[in-house]
Amino acid sequence: MFKKTKITILGATGSIGDSTLAVIRETNDFEVFALTAFSNVEKLAELCQEFKPKFAVVPDLSKKQKLQSLVTDVEVLVGESGLEKVSSLAEVDIVMSAIVGIAGLKPTFAAAKAGKKILLANKESLVTAGHLLIDEVVKNNAQLIPVDSEHNAIFQCIDNHDKKCLPEIDKIILTASGGPFRDKQLHELTDVTPEQACNHPNWQMGRKISVDSSTMVNKALEVIEAYWLFSVSADKIGVLIHPQSVIHSMVRYVDGSYIAQLGVPDMKTPIANAMYYPKRGSVNVESLDFTKYQLTFREACFERFGALKIVFNNLQNKNYAANIVFNAANEELVAAFLNKKIKYLEIIEVNKKVTKELNFENPKNIEEVFEIDRKTREYVDSVLG
């Protein structure tokens, strides 16, 4: 009898969760074991009714009561312990780690310690604790497969996904759309509104990640992820602005060859690739019509995109704690911008100041990661008043 692959989706109501569930609807190979959500209980209830998971996880008791009033045939768990449980139970085959922010750290580590196949969309697990997470993955024989379109592209371009080929890599080149303001100079962005920043030209994404794309913080975080995922030094990572988002990333090998992964901008492709790996599954995505595109590229200037400069400097100095500061400060500053408490350009300006002023030792465990994160947020709050 055919046995379906059981999947836990952390962050089921977000954009990655949506695309993951879209893949599941189109195929008959997966069984939803657990769904989690932070605030959108109504949507979670609808998903529970459709996919009938064994578990659902919400952050607190009031949301548990609300969910239980809407659905009755699912076991509802609460908080971090619930997230860690559904990420590590023996029945689970795959964990989609798609919670936004540092809240995704503990359940991702729980999945790694349980030796799971982890589909990683949560950037912060690598950004804030890459050295610790990779150790857990290796120690427990877990699998870590990137879901971000750029890293999944690199994953597909590396020969047999085998780290033995890493000495043959001359450069990993991450492509970036450049966001909605790629053709504007900094002085033109003084009065950018949250609505404008969230209007991404190529991808449908959540508000926070849309702002991150517009500032290129998203790409800066992806540089950190690539550093850990592919065990390469910072000088072997490059960024190119590619407005069409057709080439999702590429690898230059030492013999001068380039291997790139192409496709229309649709998150179902990298998600399906990760879900089915090492095989490929058939999903309904638009074919790439090469006659409709002219592919263009330009340099990602560090002076224009200050987030890249901050992160490359941190990696070159092996200052991993500074990346935690950068990430935490960004989350606070983006939230302040979306709530119209600061101006758009202050997101990077204040982050640059905070990253320079706060100095911590590189964390030795996950508790120290959270401590650096907490102290950074408190400091940013004090700066913003």
UniProtKB/Swiss-Prot annotation:
Record NCBIfam families: Dxr
HAMAP family, alphabetized: DXP_reductoisom
Protein name, entry field: 1-deoxy-D-xylulose 5-phosphate reductoisomerase
Record keyword Manganese present: yes
UniProt entry tagged with the keyword Iron-sulfur: no
PANTHER family named among the record's database cross-references: 1-DEOXY-D-XYLULOSE 5-PHOSPHATE REDUCTOISOMERASE, 1-DEOXY-D-XYLULOSE 5-PHOSPHATE REDUCTOISOMERASE, CHLOROPLASTIC
Enzyme class, UniProt record, top EC level: oxidoreductase
Cofactor(s) the protein requires to work: Mg(2+); Mn(2+)
Entry binding sites for NADPH: T13, G14, S15, I16, N40, N122, E124, G206
Primary role: Catalyzes the NADPH-dependent rearrangement and reduction of 1-deoxy-D-xylulose-5-phosphate (DXP) to 2-C-methyl-D-erythritol 4-phosphate (MEP).
Binding site for Mn(2+): D148, E150, E222
EC number: 1.1.1.267
Keywords attached to this entry: Isoprene biosynthesis, Manganese, Metal-binding, NADP, Oxidoreductase
Annotated GO MF terms: 1-deoxy-D-xylulose-5-phosphate reductoisomerase activity; manganese ion binding; NADPH binding
Protein family (similarity comment): Belongs to the DXR family.
Residues engaged in binding 1-deoxy-D-xylulose 5-phosphate: K123, S149, E150, S177, H200, S213, N218, K219, E222
Pathway(s) where this gene product acts: Isoprenoid biosynthesis; isopentenyl diphosphate biosynthesis via DXP pathway; isopentenyl diphosphate from 1-deoxy-D-xylulose 5-phosphate: step 1/6
Gene3D superfamilies: 1.10.1740.10, NAD(P)-binding Rossmann-like Domain
UniProt-listed InterPro entries: DXP_reductoisomerase, DXP_reductoisomerase_C, DXP_reductoisomerase_N, DXPR_C, DXPR_C_sf, NAD(P)-bd_dom_sf
Reactions it catalyzes: 2-C-methyl-D-erythritol 4-phosphate + NADP(+) = 1-deoxy-D-xylulose 5-phosphate + NADPH + H(+)
GO terms for biological process, alphabetical: isopentenyl diphosphate biosynthetic process, methylerythritol 4-phosphate pathway involved in terpenoid biosynthetic process
Any matching Pfam family: DXPR_C
